Curated annotation (Swiss-Prot):
This is Phenylalanine--tRNA ligase beta subunit. It comes from Nostoc sp. (strain PCC 7120 / SAG 25.82 / UTEX 2576). One of its GO terms (cellular component) is phenylalanine-tRNA ligase complex. The gene is pheT. Residues 39-150 form the tRNA-binding domain. Belongs to the phenylalanyl-tRNA synthetase beta subunit family. Type 1 subfamily.
């Protein structure tokens, strides 16, 4: 927003230079992007009067003028403007003047043989916008000749280009900036307070119909007659130009002026044009959302196709304006306007934001409504506009209608508890010659300057009543603390670091999950993420009562279904087999209520020989033990021992190639090959394996000191002693049980056990199988002798016979 210091000085006493004021505003959180010092634009330009104008003897488009600038002699000036004539007052750049906007220094010159001792200026040459082709002619008469033109043209001003943060809607007005400057500098405010307006006229000329009071909580419509449309007075035009707004006419300029002064958007309708659009003599101004298919031609000449998101102003239900965004071209004020309807309203910020975006149109009004307009100053801004229209356009107020559904004014302010201890805890010590803390009087003075009312609620505690114009951004105690820091000055607080600083760290669970992810990625698995919402229809599913889509209306009961579908989809898209894993939450119903837990699942499969290098023409699908080896490699990296037991409960998995996984007697999860029928239904490769593990059980197993902080165990440098053992064992006895018994019996010297042969068939007793194991014995401090190994090995043999009834073959 462009801030005129001349205008600002009328609202608040300013004794600072523009640069000092810009620094204070910047340190308080308002970015001053530019300081436009207009005082340098017309240095040496004075008021002159054209006494005589003669055609140039050597050029048809030039004139030779005699100009009186209050000096002892008149100046002979050659001018090329078509509107120059005798007996007018004009700005004259005298010899020696420099015009920075056109980079021109005035010197005596000869133009087509005629001497010229200066230049009669246009507004553009002085840096001001102008729609007139030619020099500027002062509308005033009897101006003092030779006087400085800068006060007459508003060039004795400095403009600050200030950007307010998004939460400071109150700072989008001159009054808001004045309040801020007063709070920062302890200056006195002089905010104009318009008086009450009198309504003199008949009743019933206007009706209001608000269809959605949430979108429009307040609307004031005022009928004004006998209006005389003309140019605005020079002071008003100068203020609009300084703010970057083009003057149009007195009524339109007044609405723009009040917008800049109070931050309240207004709109003026031509009453006769409203009646023409409504096709009726009596008018009902309405506020409603647009119907599909409606259109509106806005003031910028564009025809807008409206949607149900557009909030409209209507005349007898005919669209005449985009509420809070832009008026309609059919009802705009023009030179022949004699009666008005002035709109002053409050619109919901969300409704205006949606309406503005849906048509791709933003305006000064919509920008303010989107941030939030002060609902307590609607009547003030309306009275200000009405008094100016009465004064500058001779308007007579004949009728006013008000629709107001705002809550009680007492609710326009909120009360927040503020603690002095909390203020000092958050902000820290201040520099007051020596390190100290903010005192109660400092907090009270700062917040009172902002317009807050403080009521003591105990020692070092206040109930702070926030003014209505700060209602939207001062909501919590921390907001008030920020205001104290901002106004007291961030640079007045000590910049010392806290005495103690602890390095951040991840919780153990998060650290372990990261290690788990890294281990799975190291095995070539890609992490996948799927929606938690799935199709309904499974047992024990939790179904949502208000789903966004019917096909995503239930919570997933496991992760495997999503992984299998992803594997199938990648094959269909020609991307090959997808080896991946997912960590996520699953949900299900029990008799005692709803349950949820974290799980980790994965899918592995396809032909491992596929790639850029040919390994033969025959497919080499992944074997069960190869897939199991990938999982075991992950377990080995994490330092945990997992047991496998046969399992056939999941119908999606092969009943003979599925195992449940156990850790320390707790069920960890399941691993197995997809059922052949499911594989055929989904057209998947021959060998696809999946696993799903309970993440909580997994993390509990990992949460041990020897795993979290592994210690190095030196390798033995002594040779090993190998022994093979073969026997017939019942088929019902698993290899894992046998290995467990061998490890227990050989504990101390036994380093490893590995099965290397299994045989079923001829010469093997019914119901048994032949198994062969290799046992490796080793000591860390010596070379083992046969006399040391044999007793331990015999103990292993005896344990197998005693526990499983095996028939030893070696």
């Amino acid at each position: 927003m462009r801030i005129s210091l001349n205008w600002l000085r009328e609202l608040v006493e300013i004794k600072l230079s523009p640069e000092e004021l810009a620094h204070i505003l910047t340190m308080a959180g308002f970015e001053v992007e530019d300081i436009e010092d207009r005082r340098t634009w017309a240095n040496g330009v004075v008021v002159g009067r054209v006494l005589e104008r003669q055609p140039h003897p050597n050029a048809d488009k030039l004139s030779v003028c005699q100009v009186d600038v209050g000096a002892s002699e008149t100046l002979n000036i050659v001018c090329g403007a078509p509107n120059v004539r005798a007996d007018i007052y004009v700005p004259v750049a005298t010899v020696g003047a420099y015009l920075p906007n056109i980079d021109l220094k005035i010197k005596p010159a000869k133009l087509r043989g005629v001497p010229s001792q200066g230049m009669i200026c246009s507004l553009k040459e002085l840096g001001l916008p102008s729609e007139v082709d030619g020099i500027y002619i002062f509308p005033q008469e009897n101006l003092p000749l030779g006087s400085d033109v800068r006060p007459l043209l508003g060039l004795d001003d400095v403009i600050l280009d200030v950007t307010a943060t998004a939460n400071r809607a109150d700072a989008l007005s001159m009054v808001g900036i004045a309040r801020e400057v007063a709070a920062l500098t302890d200056a006195k405010l002089n905010i104009p307070e318009p008086g009450e307006v009198s309504v003199s006229g008949s009743v019933g000329k206007l009706g209001l119909k608000i269809a959605d009071t949430q979108a429009c909580p307040a609307y004031i419509g005022t009928v004004i007659e006998q209006v005389k449309i003309a140019s605005s007075p020079e002071w008003l035009q100068q203020r609009l130009r300084s703010a970057g707004v083009r003057p149009i006419s007195n009524v339109v300029d007044i609405t723009n002026y009040v917008l800049l002064e109070w931050g309240q958007p207004l709109h003026a309708f031509d009453q006769e044009r409203l009646k023409f659009v409504a096709n009726a003599d009596s008018l009902t101004i309405g506020v409603r959302f647009a119907n599909p298919g409606e259109t509106l031609k806005t003031l910028d000449g564009q025809t807008r196709n409206l949607t149900t998101q557009n909030l409209l102003i209507t005349a007898n239900d005919q669209p005449v304006a985009l509420a809070g965004v832009m008026g309609g071209e059919e009802t705009e004020v023009h030179e022949g306007t004699q009666s008005l309807i002035l709109e002053a309203a409050l619109f919901d910020s969300v409704a205006i934001r949606r309406s503005s975006r849906s048509v791709g149109l933003r305006s000064e009004a919509s920008g303010r409504y989107e941030r939030g307009v002060n609902r307590a100053e609607l009547e003030i801004a309306n009275r200000r506009a009405l008094s100016l229209i009465s004064e500058l356009a001779a308007g007579v107020i004949v009728h006013q209608e008000i629709a107001d559904t705002r809550p009680d004014p007492a609710s326009w302010s909120r009360s927040i508890l503020l603690r002095l201890d909390r203020v000092n805890e958050v902000l820290g010590p201040i520099n007051v010659g020596e390190t100290g803390e903010l005192e109660a009087k400092d907090v009270e003075r700062t917040l009172t300057a902002l317009g807050c009312e403080l009521t003591p609620a105990g020692e070092g505690t206040w109930n702070v009543s926030v003014p209505p114009y700060r209602y939207r951004d001062l909501e919590r105690e921390i907001d008030l603390i920020e205001e104290v820091a901002r106004l007291y000055g961030y640079d007045n607080f000590c910049d010392t670091l806290p005495d103690k600083a602890e390095a951040g760290y991840l919780p153990v669970d998060q650290e372990l999950v990261r290690k788990l992810r890294a281990a799975l990625r190291a095995e070539g698995l890609t992490e996948l993420i799927h929606y938690s919402l799935v199709k309904p229809g499974e047992d024990r599913q939790i179904v949502l009562s208000n789903p966004l889509f019917a096909e995503y209306s239930a919570l997933r009961t496991d992760l495997l279904a999503g992984l299998i579908d992803a594997f199938q989809y990648n094959l269909e898209q020609g991307n090959g087999s997808l080896n991946g894993f997912e960590i996520g939450r699953i949900f299900w119903q029990e008799e005692d209520g709803l349950q949820e837990k974290d799980a980790i699942a994965g899918i592995i499969g396809g032909d491992t020989s596929l790639g850029k290098w040919s390994k033969g023409s025959k497919e080499q699908p992944l074997a069960w033990f190869e897939a199991k080896g990938i999982l075991e490699s992950v377990f080995q990296q994490l330092g945990i021992l997992v047991e496998y037991q046969p399992d056939c409960r999941d119908e999606r998995l092969h009943p003979g190639r599925t195992a449940s996984l156990w850790i320390g007697g707790n069920r960890l999860g399941i691993f197995g090959q997809l059922h052949p029928q499911l594989r055929r239904d989904k057209d998947l490769p021959e060998s696809v394996y999946v696993f799903q593990l309970d993440l909580d059980v997994f993390l509990n197993a990992l949460d041990k000191d020897e795993i979290l902080v592994p210690t190095f165990k030196p390798y033995s440098t002594y040779p090993a002693s190998d022994r093979d053992i073969a026997f017939f064992a019942p088929v019902k006895v698993s290899v894992s049980e046998i290995e467990k018994a061998i490890n227990k019996a050989g504990k101390g010297l036994l380093e490893s056990v590995e099965i290397f042969d299994e045989y079923r068939g001829e010469n093997v007793p019914q119901g048994q199988r032949s198994l062969a194991f290799r046992l490796v014995y080793r000591a860390s401090d010596r070379t083992l002798t046969d006399t040391e190994v044999e007793p331990v090995h015999n103990k292993v043999r005896e344990a197998l016979v005693e526990k499983f009834g095996v028939n030893l073959r070696s």
